[in-house]
Curated annotation (Swiss-Prot):
Pfam families, per the entry: AIRS, AIRS_C
GO molecular function: ATP binding; phosphoribosylamine-glycine ligase activity; phosphoribosylformylglycinamidine cyclo-ligase activity
Protein EC: 6.3.3.1
A single GO cellular-component term on record: cytosol
Substrates-to-products reaction catalysed: 2-formamido-N(1)-(5-O-phospho-beta-D-ribosyl)acetamidine + ATP = 5-amino-1-(5-phospho-beta-D-ribosyl)imidazole + ADP + phosphate + H(+)
Keywords annotated in UniProt: ATP-binding, Cytoplasm, Ligase, Nucleotide-binding, Purine biosynthesis
GO-annotated biological processes: 'de novo' IMP biosynthetic process; adenine biosynthetic process
Protein name: Phosphoribosylformylglycinamidine cyclo-ligase
Length: 352
């Protein structure tokens, strides 16, 4: 080896550039038990391969695969601000699997993407632990993921998340809203809070109010706990409902960005609209606080937040009592919130 001139630059390593491969390996070892806990019998192999394997051969006759991807929006900014990282992964899973559930599909497996400027192993492990917990609750295998350490891309201490899921449903049992008809009834199932939508407005209101971290809402729940409550996972109870009352359920909607105004109508055929009675349920305290502190108009609330309704079933009118009883048996708070009506033109949703 030739001698290095004294004027030559000192040798650099990847760690010098801001990427710590050893930290990434340590993270993988720490999360392995959590990830394996989420596995289903169909998972083939373990972690660390170039591709994750899943055997679909024995469960479905005519499977239709349903895929979904999502993030948690600027709820992440609030998580960073409050240093709460253990449940944001549940939000990530729920945002993805609740979406594919709308088609009647069972989530099979999930992959995550975690990106940060400098990897903090404790923070990343807390986040992935939440993802694994969410997958376990949804019956969905956390089959793989990517941890990207990218110096100079993110503010110190911050990270971004994305999730991806694949689900399956028998072709004959696919829910696409085609059977929705005038007279069908809307059953709204309770949310756990704002879930993961509207947080740019939430944070603006929270900041304008002086970030009242210790404020207690009606009922004794702290405001920050209500704002950070993880998105409710509807997978297991809804799949159970579909097995027992699938023919009675003509359509479903996950109430995400766009709120009640824009989500239910996505599964309603042209020529039909929605008449939603806002008085049929009580606006939860966290939404009451947001509306009052932000002086937010009713129409803006309906279009931004779920307002206490996280998932909606569109049900045949003669089956409402039976489906309501089945929802109750699943331990879910719910209300009859409106019906499908004939409607022409641009204004197809009425909330009053």
């Amino acid at each position: 080896m030739t001698n290095t001139p004294s004027s030559a630059p000192s040798p650099l390593t990847y760690r010098d550039a801001g990427v710590d491969i050893d930290a990434g390996n340590e993270l993988v070892e720490r999360i392995k038990p959590l990830v394996k806990r989420s596995f289903r019998p169909e998972v083939m192999g373990g972690l660390g391969g170039f591709g994750a394997l899943f055997d679909l051969s024995n469960k479905y006759r005519e499977p239709v695969l349903v895929s979904g991807t999502d993030g948690v929006g600027t709820k992440l900014k609030l998580a960073h601000q409050l240093n709460r990282h253990d449940t944001i992964g549940i939000d990530l899973v729920a945002m993805c699997v609740n979406d594919v559930l709308v088609q009647g599909a069972e989530p099979l497996f999930f992959l995550d993407y975690f990106a940060t400027g400098k990897l903090d192993i404790d923070t990343a492990a807390a986040v992935v632990g939440g993802i694994a917990n969410g997958c376990t609750e949804a019956g969905c295998a956390l089959i793989g993921g990517e941890t990207a350490e990218m110096p100079d891309m993110y503010a110190p201490g911050e990270y971004d998340l994305a999730g991806f899921t694949v689900a399956a449903v028998e072709k004959s049992e696919l829910k696409d809203g085609a059977s929705v008809a005038a007279g069908d009834v809307l059953i709204g199932i309770a949310s756990s809070g704002p879930h993961s939508n509207g947080y740019s407005l939430v944070r603006r209101i929270y900041d304008r109010a002086g970030r009242p971290a210790e404020l207690e809402l009606e009922g004794g729940v702290k405001l920050v706990d209500a704002l950070m409550a993880p998105t409710r996972l509807y997978v297991k109870p809804i799949l159970s409902l579909l097995k027992s009352h699938g023919a009675a359920i003509h359509g479903m909607a996950h109430i995400t960005g766009g709120g009640l105004t824009e989500n239910i109508i996505r599964v309603v055929p042209e020529g039909l609209g929605l008449d939603i009675q806002a008085s049929s349920w009580t606006l939860p305290p966290v939404f009451q606080w947001l509306q009052k502190e932000g002086a937010v108009a009713d129409s803006e609330m309906w279009r931004t937040f779920n307002c206490g309704i996280g998932f909606v079933l569109i049900v045949a009118p003669d089956q409402v009592a039976a489906v309501s009883e089945a929802v109750k048996a699943q331990g879910l708070d719910h209300w009859t919130i409106g019906q499908v009506v004939t409607a022409e033109g641009a204004e197809r949703v009425h909330i009053g």
